[in-house]
């Protein structure tokens, strides 16, 4: 059931809602959002907002997060007043009655507000491809009523999703037909839309843990794993947001297990956990090996000794 005022839903289906804003610019995002966990998506958009705003001179410049810097390109500066038109089908950015950007929701990936309590709080960034499905960018706007923008956009996405499901369930001749496979539906079914008010994610609790090393390459991780049972958790330096459990087996082999599946769930072969810390604690406290099934064979890691991250305490 669509929990939206009917007249508002019809407005979104027809002319859409227009809001005045300042279009600051955009920056290419070369990495697919689908491979990133939720907090990494937020971090990418937050860094893009800050980077674009600093480039056009409306905020102070600061160093970009090194992980994010690998997945974004050069800023395209704009900084002019626009109207943002949001309908149930797309987002349009209009300058002096001329359409300059059009992003159908089928190519919309992710959006987030600027960081609260900073000079980007009234800014909003969203990642989308253009109308022909190419040129993935984070587009950044400044808008006084940023919360209204978020509310309208969230509602438009809900209407779009509802309409797509309704159209999929009934054929033109009135007979009920199966819904299409998920890959053929609007990509909104697979995307998260966030503001600063969001629930904690499955990976946020790793920060500060003695065994968490942050961004670390496979080679550097292996150099730290000296004996059987040594383990650490790291974030891949090649794929932002991919969390990996690295350890050394009884056969003195290095193993690297991806901790999140395609739905951002923390899983092993045997069970699902609410977060990464729960997975680590469960296997350490019970003396159980972490088991994961690969294409060729099962991988098993005993978690005996956490390798402490430099600068962390040896005891949590």
From Swiss-Prot:
Residue numbers marked as site, Required for interaction with svh-2: 234
Domain SH2, first and last residues per copy: 211-307
Annotated stretches, region: Disordered: 292-316
SMART domains in alphabetical order: PTB, SH2
Effect ascribed to mutating residue 136 to K: Partial sensitivity to Cu(2+). No effect on the association with mek-1
A GO term for molecular function: insulin-like growth factor receptor binding
CDD domains (alphabetical): PTB, SH2_SHC
Record annotation: effect of changing residue 234 to K: Weak sensitivity to Cu(2+). Severe sensitivity to Cu(2+) and no effect on the association with mek-1. Abolishes interaction with svh-2
Annotated membrane topology: Peripheral membrane protein
Identification of the protein by name: SHC-transforming protein homolog 1
Gene: shc-1
């Amino acid at each position: 059931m669509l929990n939206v005022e009917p007249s508002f839903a019809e407005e979104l289906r027809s002319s859409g809602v227009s809001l005045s804003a300042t279009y600051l610019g955009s920056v290419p995002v070369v990495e697919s959002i689908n491979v990133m966990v939720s907090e990494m998506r937020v971090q990418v958009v937050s860094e893009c907002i800050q980077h674009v705003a600093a480039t056009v001179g409306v905020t102070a410049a600061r160093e970009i997060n090194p992980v994010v810097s690998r997945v974004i390109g050069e800023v395209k500066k704009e900084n002019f007043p626009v109207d943002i038109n949001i309908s149930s089908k797309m987002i349009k950015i209009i300058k002096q009655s001329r359409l300059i950007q059009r992003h159908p929701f089928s190519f919309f990936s992710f959006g987030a507000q600027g960081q609260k309590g900073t000079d980007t709080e009234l800014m909003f960034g969203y990642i989308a491809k253009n109308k022909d499905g190419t040129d993935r960018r984070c587009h950044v706007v400044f808008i006084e009523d940023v919360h209204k923008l978020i509310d309208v956009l969230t509602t438009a996405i809900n209407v779009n999703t509802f309409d797509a499901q309704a159209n999929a369930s009934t054929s033109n001749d009135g007979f009920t037909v199966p819904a299409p496979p998920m890959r053929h539906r609007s990509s909104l079914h697979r995307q998260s839309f966030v503001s600063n008010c969001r629930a904690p994610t499955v990976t946020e609790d790793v920060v500060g843990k003695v065994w968490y090393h942050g961004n670390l390459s496979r080679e550097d991780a292996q150099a730290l794993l000296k004996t059987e049972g040594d383990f650490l958790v790291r974030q891949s330096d090649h794929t932002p947001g991919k969390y990996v459990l690295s350890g050394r087996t009884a056969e003195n082999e290095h193993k690297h297990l991806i901790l999140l599946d395609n739905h951002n769930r923390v899983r092993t072969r045997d069970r699902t956990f609410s977060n990464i810390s729960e997975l680590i604690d469960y296997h350490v406290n019970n003396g159980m090996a972490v088991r994961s099934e690969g294409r060729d064979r099962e991988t098993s890691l005993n978690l005996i000794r956490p390798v402490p991250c430099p600068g962390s305490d040896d005891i949590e």
